[in-house]
Amino acid sequence: MKQRYIYIAAALLTLGVTGVRSAFAGQLTTDNCQQTLHPEANDSQFSIFNSDTTSILSTLHSETLKASEDARPTTLKECLEKGLNKNYSLRIIRNEEQIAANNATMENAGLLPSVSLSAGYSGSAYGNNTTPREGDVVKNRGIYDDGIDAGIDVSWTLFDGFKTVANYDRLRELSLISSTQTRLAVENYMAELTAEYYNFVQQRQRLQNYVSAVELSRERLRIVYERWMIGSLSRLDLLQARVDFNADSAQCLKQRELLASSRIRLHELMAQDSLDVNFTTLEENIALLTLPTFDDLWMQTKENNASMIMAAQNRTLADIELRSVRSRNYPYVKLNGGYGYRTNHYGAGGTLRRNQWSGDVGVSVGFNLYDGKRRSEQRNARLNVKNAELEEYDLTLSLYTDLADLWQAYENNRMLLALEKENVVAARENYAIAHERYLLGDLSGIEMREAQKSLLDAEERILVAEYNTKVCEISLLQLSGGITAYME
């Protein structure tokens, strides 16, 4: 069985959004959303914020504030602890593990004797006529005879070609496999929850980016409106600024939905009673761990990977099944014994009561000469052993390939992140210069928008690179069996 990992291709990780955290991050408030410049203007078409826009932005701001004020910041460790205890899928698989452990007993394997106790009662009522050779007929009526019996029987297979021993080993190995399956499910769950936790961090940062973008667009719209009022800018400039502001506002609303979806998914993974509970993370940024070298990770993978361990257990199980089939080549020896007691009470005749004790013991030896399918089953069992070995080799190669791919993606994303951090410095300086020139009237609105978009895109690329690197880190730790590092 190959392990299902949480890692996703970089193309799927990128959500296609362009909002980013601005260097001039400002908080979108109800007051500044409702602010309308030059209220004395009679042309309502050019009101900077109409009633619909004001209502939407006010709702966005109030819900964002409520979510941050009502929710207690939660760490990743707290989320994992809560989820590991409450998640329904994990609780089910733990119960299945307990069932497998309960089945791994000598009794279920047939190593212990079978003991049965029986008891019974019988009675009969009758009458008769006795005619002697001399004398009158003797009539007996209402005669009742009864009897009580009890016994204990023992049956024990002393030898069956070691089949019972193989059965016991098989049950114990199945119990170990069930434990490994539980571990695999726990590791998959931890990886999924950790990835979703940092996805929430990413989505929250992205929402802050869009709020900042709206604030920047609002400021630009205010400037354009004032210049339009005095005739220094055209109606086209005003309309373009309004279109850009509305576009940023729409992106902000869409991002709120994505953040809510991530929050709901986290509550589902943690099996929360209500999915509408406000939630926020203690971590405001995506922090990366320091990973071992590739060679060290590969050594840990060979030793600790749950799928690798399960493959070895499946190979052992195939060996046990072969031993079980081969046991039919040997004779069997069975021991049977019993002890009984019976008492009878007679309603007529010269005997009133009779008590009887009896015991028996026997040994049976047999050999199955031919059953029509023994040889084919043994050949198939040997092939199953070979297949288990091949599957283990195939899994080793697959895990090495996955590890190499993940390591390459991890290293590339780290270099990309370092490059984007340098790039954002230039983008911030470029925006600062553009903003200053725009205030002086030396820069057009389109050029100003382009500088703003360049900064936002640079910040977004950092956010995506951080999350992609984190997902690769999670997958590498999951692959090498070190996912529990997030519990520390």
Which role fits each region the language model picked out?
Residues T53, A67-A71, S118-W156, T281-L291, ...:
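Small/polar, glycine/serine/threonine/aspartate-rich low-complexity segments that form flexible
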Residues R91-N95, N108-A109, Y144, L158-V186, ...:
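Sec/SRP-type N-terminal targeting helices
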Residues T75, K82, S89, D146, ...:
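Surface positions of alpha-helical coiled-coils, especially the charged/polar e/g heptad sites
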Residues H38, D52, S58, T74-E78, ...:
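Periplasmic alpha-helical coiled-coil/stalk elements that build and connect Gram-negative outer-membrane
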Residues F49-N50, A247-Q272, V425-G482:
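Short segments within alpha-helical structural elements
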